[in-house]
Amino acid sequence: MIDKDGNTLSFVEEHRIRRTLRTIRSRVRRLIVRAALDALEDGVGSVNLVAPGDVYEELFSFIGAGTLFTEMQYGFVRPVSIDDFEEVEALIVRGQTEGHLLPRTPEQIAQILPSCWGYRIGDEHLAGICSLLTEPYRRDRAGEITAMYTLTRFQGEGVAAVLVREILKEARARRLKYLFACTSDDLVAALFSRLGFERARASDVPAAKWRGYDPSRIASLSILRAHLG
């Protein structure tokens, strides 16, 4: 399924299916969507709608091609477990390859895995991840949101926003003074701003953040900070 702008809808909850039915002109397409809704009403947990030629991409790639129909909000955020490490590492490497994440060595990735959180689609795969890094900043009682990445097929579905909101809750529960994030992506910076983060200077975050950091790169970063007091 696609939205009014021609973008694929990765997942659609039941209440949105009913609205969608009213806008579909094709009788065949309306019948297909109606069948998915009927299945949900009959107790099926979820229905995946995908074109026959896209089945392989849907099942065996990170990109995906179909639309997942669910009765209610299907994703949830939780800290990753050791059983998730391999999947999380694969997403971080993918994000680095695509240029969305700062390059890290395998050893550096291994160090942040225990601090990662994931947005999981039901009992299936991870749609997005991020890390709440606190150990380097414990003296400052601060935390950094880093290694945030959302799979291409779920971008625009609010996954990153849900992750950040959950991290904010966790940070408050840990009585951190503030959270910060650094990004060179204007869209990511805008997301943090919408969620209450404010623009900051390099000196407004722990000095430990910049140890070994390329000084020339700092100037290109948007540094955002959320006070939690």
Question: What are these language model-derived features?
Answer:
Residues 1-111, 156:
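C-terminal catalytic "cap/lid" subdomain
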Residues 45, 177, 198:
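Short acidic/polar active-site loop segments enriched in Thr and Asp
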Residues 103-150:
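A conserved beta-strand-loop-helix scaffold within acyl/acetyltransferase catalytic domains
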Residues 150, 156-169:
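Conserved acetyl-CoA-binding loop-helix of GNAT-fold acetyltransferases
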Residues 171-184:
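Conserved GNAT acetyl-CoA-binding A-motif
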Residues 185-213:
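Conserved active-site alpha-helix within GNAT-family acetyltransferase domains
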